[in-house]
Amino acid sequence: MLLIPAIDLKDGKCVRLKQGDMNDSTTFGEDPAAMARRWVDAGARRLHLVDLNGAFAGKPVNEGAIKSIIAAVGGDIPIQLGGGIRDLDTIERYLDDGLSYVIIGTAAVKNPGFLRDACTAFGGHIIVGLDARDGKVATDGWSKLTGHEVVDLARKFQDYGVEGVIYTDIGRDGMLSGINIEATVKLAQALTIPVIASGGLSNMADIDALCAVEHEGVDGVICGRSIYSGDLDFAAGQKRADELNGGRV
């Protein structure tokens, strides 16, 4: 079970949003590269970046900060990025810069052909991000709720060849209210590709619960507000996960 620290970028700074609200953000760092190094030094084996401005603008905005993170730790661990990725040229540029994976969210839901083309052109590097409330997929920085069922879309995207799915429960993200284990497992059971949980991780009990369902296909969890607020010690959490699944993955 991988614990994956999230670095959410807004105006070049490291922030956390509450339930995806750009007007309700807390700044946790002015130096994204230093933040990335902090998590790698604490034992992170993958990083999750989000270009928040990009997600709302529909194009890359925080490229300078992203490149600084890649320069700092890209040679050490894989880095995945979501937010504002809407065309193949952007994907190619990011992968050339040194990212390991790009995460396609809104664009995958609105334009499935784009996701299919991305999987064809950049096989092994495309992750789909599905954000949902009550099982229904949301788009556009969580501002629009669709009628699509998460499981149905995920199966379709699996057929396209995506490398994995990041599943975010919008109602819990940034609230420290616990991972929605039931919904995450339901999705993982419907797929053969890995599912990464996101939204609500708050403490060691959540890690215990996730490790208990790792065999269902839940391979990792995005760590956000909890590791910044101090509610969860990241290094201790990853150590616990390693112990529970029988050693380092």
Curated annotation (Swiss-Prot):
InterPro entries: Aldolase_TIM (IPR013785), His_biosynth (IPR006062), HisA_bact_arch (IPR006063), Isoase_HisA-like (IPR044524), Isoase_HisA-like_bact (IPR023016), RibuloseP-bd_barrel (IPR011060). It comes from the Bacteria. GO terms for cellular component: cytoplasm. GO terms for biological process: L-histidine biosynthetic process; L-tryptophan biosynthetic process. One of its GO terms (molecular function) is 1-(5-phosphoribosyl)-5-[(5-phosphoribosylamino)methylideneamino]imidazole-4-carboxamide isomerase activity. It is found in: Cytoplasm. It catalyses: 1-(5-phospho-beta-D-ribosyl)-5-[(5-phospho-beta-D-ribosylamino)methylideneamino]imidazole-4-carboxamide = 5-[(5-phospho-1-deoxy-D-ribulos-1-ylimino)methylamino]-1-(5-phospho-beta-D-ribosyl)imidazole-4-carboxamide. Signal peptide: none annotated. Pathway: Amino-acid biosynthesis; L-histidine biosynthesis; L-histidine from 5-phospho-alpha-D-ribose 1-diphosphate: step 4/9. The keyword Isomerase applies. This is 1-(5-phosphoribosyl)-5-[(5-phosphoribosylamino)methylideneamino] imidazole-4-carboxamide isomerase. It comes from Leptothrix cholodnii (strain ATCC 51168 / LMG 8142 / SP-6) (Leptothrix discophora (strain SP-6)).
